Amino acid sequence: MPPSPDAPEAGSSRDRGWRVVQAQFLQSAPSVEACPPGDRPEIAIAGRSNVGKSSLLNALVGQRGLARVSRTPGRTQLLNVFELTLAGPGGARRTLRCVDLPGYGFAAARREVRQGFAPMIEGYLAEREALRALVLLVDARRGELSDLDQQLLEFASDHQRPTLLVITKADKLGAAARGLVRRRLADSVGVAPRDVLLTSASTGLGLQGPDGLAADLAALCEPEPA
């Protein structure tokens, strides 16, 4: 798959660090139509079941209980919407929404539930006007994209959605193994290794600072030209 032409690059929103200064859960929506009004830029967060979406979001905002962490893979079946305010250099601020998409790829989820995931996820990615980008999470211990990951990236590309690839649970691997996984994933989507973000909810790796996830979100949600 060719790299997204709109993936975040170094620029004004990444010159110095950004951090989340306020976060709140807004709602769980059973459909795209039930989501809040699209008056804020939105970032979709996707990945396989138990990839660590909730843990990463909690670590990013510094609130352990903001997003519920389920020990049952495939349990999240709604669009969970969170609003974040980020503070950056020179007093700059961004308010955006992170939309946690249903996890996918877990065999134990009921078939009818799994079949319901695809229309919801695809409908959101295709139809949501406020959506700025897709952030796809991949477990460092898997080390590669699944077929479903690939399909989601291709679907996002077909609908001109910028994508950001984020490796979770990087603390579970040594430095050499992390580098190998990063290069492998970068090669699989045709980007430079530096454009694949290494993160850990446990240690805070890759969340703050000029090259962290908070800065990437700020860059993706820069105000559009008038």
Which residues fall in each region the model found?
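Conserved C-terminal guanine-recognition region of P-loop GTPase G domains, centered on the G4
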Residues: 118-194
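Canonical P-loop GTPase G-domain recognition
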Residues: 20-33, 172-226
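Switch II of P-loop NTPase G domains
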Residues: 35, 75-81, 91-96, 102-132, ...
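Alpha-helix termini
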Residues: 86-92, 128, 221-225
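Conserved G1/Walker A P-loop phosphate-binding module
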Residues: 2-108
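Helical mechanochemical/support elements of P-loop NTPase systems and associated helical scaffolds
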Residues: 39, 65, 78, 94, ...
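Conserved nucleotide-binding/hydrolysis micro-motifs of P-loop NTPases
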Residues: 74-75, 103-105, 140-144, 170-174, ...
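Conserved amphipathic alpha-helical interaction elements at protein-protein interfaces in regulatory
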Residues: 62-66, 127, 158, 219, ...
